[in-house]
Each structure stands twice: as structure tokens, then as C-alpha cells.
Amino acid sequence: MKRRLTALVISFLLGLLLFHFRIPIPFMLSGIVSASVLKFFIWTDMRWPLLWRNLGLLAAGYGIGRSFTHETLVQMSQHVAGVFGASFVAIGISLLVAWFTYKHTFANLLSCIMGMLPGGLNQMMLMADEDPRADANVVVMQQTIRLFGVVISVPFLVIHLLGASVVPQGLLAPVGDNTGLTWLLMIPVAGIGSVVAKKLKVPTAALIGPIMATAAFSIICNVNLQKPPPILMNLAQLNIGLYMGCMLDKERLLRTRVLLPYAIIGTLLLIGGSIAVAEILVRHYGIPIVTAFLAMAPGGMTEMCLAGMSMGADVSIILTYQIVRLLMMNLTVPFFIRRYFDDSYTG
């Protein structure tokens, strides 16, 4: 408990510094950096409670889901071609990077594909664990570098490259007329959504369940739900960030360090491809470049949606692109692997 309290205090203080400099998702980034440094250099066995992470995702899911209305559904229906086209581009870039890595390193092609696809770290880890032909060390290392690289670099790119700015908000209490406690009434609804999604084995159920439950309530009841208070979202960011930072595995990174340059280059190519496709989406659909880039960024879904919230971007569009790509990855990748890599495949 002492370790967790120390990590929490350090993360909070670093988050205050990032908040002062108007950095997007400051407390999530501070949690990732603090936990990563502590685990890599001091407490190699440090873990963050899954329950705390899931409670953070519950709050984040409500904050994201409340942005869905009848109007956003109509708007999203106009993006069908863009959503699927963007997803195929992301998959294509990932496969090219995986093939290049396979040709120049010791890793087999199956492991490289699982490692580079932006389909969710947890999902790819589970697939690697269940398939004896895949090298779990390779998959986890590549996915970790991709996720950390994107989550840490994208907020800075959005600010300094695309000219976005963080929407002013209170640190602990809401500003303006966003006061009251009506948001508390929605927490049980979001919780039920999380439970149902887990029962249905939905990917990333702890996040998607609350999003879907909140969105359904907002659309069916035709109400504009209250924003969650900043203190709730900041605590959610801290717990999500600390959990992500504790996912860093020093031993895995050292065992697969020869793959590190390829993982970094692959991540940069994915980000570059995201910017290029975002420009196409801006010209075709007329959406802001920040929204388009966060929608295309190669994960994670939670982090990109929270970054969009902090910068006033259209979170419903960001979520639509991110969730469709996530579902495509989780539904098509296992089928593709079974068809292309038969039982005799040895790498």
C-alpha cells in the first residue's frame, strides 16, 4: 500500500505540473510516466489494482458516452465509408511494418502481426498466450511500445503540430453552470453496462459497456446528460495511467530489445499514416483536424477519447472510428490467423 500511495502522490504532483502547462490528459500522462519509472528502476514487481483501473474506465465511459445524441447518430451515419476506409489503412500499414520486422529480426511473422496491429494490448496479449506459435514476449513488447508511444506523443503533436488547445476547466470543481450532482444518478447505469458487456464478452468491456449504456440512456430518453466533475475525471485519468505504467515489463523489454527500433519506427509510421488519412477526412467530411487525427490515431481508444474531451473535439466521431477499428481487429484477426497460419506453421 505504501508503494501505491507513493506512486499516487508523485503522479498527482506531476499531473498538477502538466495541468499548469495546459497539456492534454495531464493526470493520465503523469500516471504512465510515474509508474513506468518507478517500476523500471525501483519496484520491478509493482502492480496497480485492476478494480481501481476499471472504476476509472467506468467514469471515463460515462464522460464519453454522454456525448452521444440523436444528432450525433445522424452525423455518424455519414461517415461509414470513412470509418471502414480508415480502419483498412491502419491495418495495411500495420501489416507492412510487421512483414518488414519479420524479414529483419528473429521474430516470426505471426508474432510481428499480433505485435503491430492496433487492436488493443489486452486482446493481442490474450491471443498470443493462447497460440503456442506466437512469441508472447515479442507481442507484448511491440504492443507496449506502440501504446506508450502513441499515448504520450499524440497529445503533444495535437498541441504543437496541429495547433489545438486545451479547453479551460477547473482542477477539482466544475466551472460555469456545470454544477449539481445529477451525474451521480448515471453511475449505476454505467455500472450495469459494464457488467452486461463483460457477460457478453465484449472487447474492452469495462469501457465500452459504460459508454453504450450511457449513450443508450441519452438517446432513448432524449436528454443532455451533465458533464462529470473534473475531480472525477482526473482521478479516473490517474488510475488508468498508473495501471498502464505498471504494465511495463523490464525483463520482456530487455529480452526483446533488438526489436525496439522496429517497434518505434512502426509506431511513427502508424502516427504518420494517421495524420495523412486525417487530412483526407478533413477535406471529405469537413471535420476539424484535431478530431480527425484523434479518430485515426492508433490507440488506445480510452486515451484518444479523453484527449478529445480535454480539447473540445467531437468525441462521438473519435469513438466511432476507434471502436469500429477495435471491433474489426478483434473479429477479423483471429479468422485471418486461422486461415493463413495453419497448424503446421512454425515461423
What do the predicted segments below correspond to?
Residues R4-T6, I10, F68-W99, W183, ...:
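Entry/N-cap segments of selected transmembrane alpha helices
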Residues L8-F12, L17-F19, G163-V223:
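Core mid-bundle transmembrane helix pairs that form the ion/substrate translocation pathway
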Residues L18-V33, W52-G56, H79-A90, C112-M116, ...:
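Structural signature of hydrophobic alpha-helical transmembrane segments
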Residues I32-F41, D45-Q78, A213-I220, P230-T256:
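Hydrophobic transmembrane alpha-helices of secondary-active transporters
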Residues H70-Q78, L161-D177, N222-P229, L254-R255, ...:
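Membrane-interface helix termini and inter-helical loops of multi-pass transporters
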Residues V89-A90, G120-M124, V140-L162, M301, ...:
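Membrane-embedded alpha-helical segments of transport systems
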Residues H104-I145, I287-Q322:
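Alpha-helical membrane segments and immediately flanking helix-loop junctions
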Residues V196-S274, A278:
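Transmembrane helical segments that form the transport core of multi-pass membrane transport proteins
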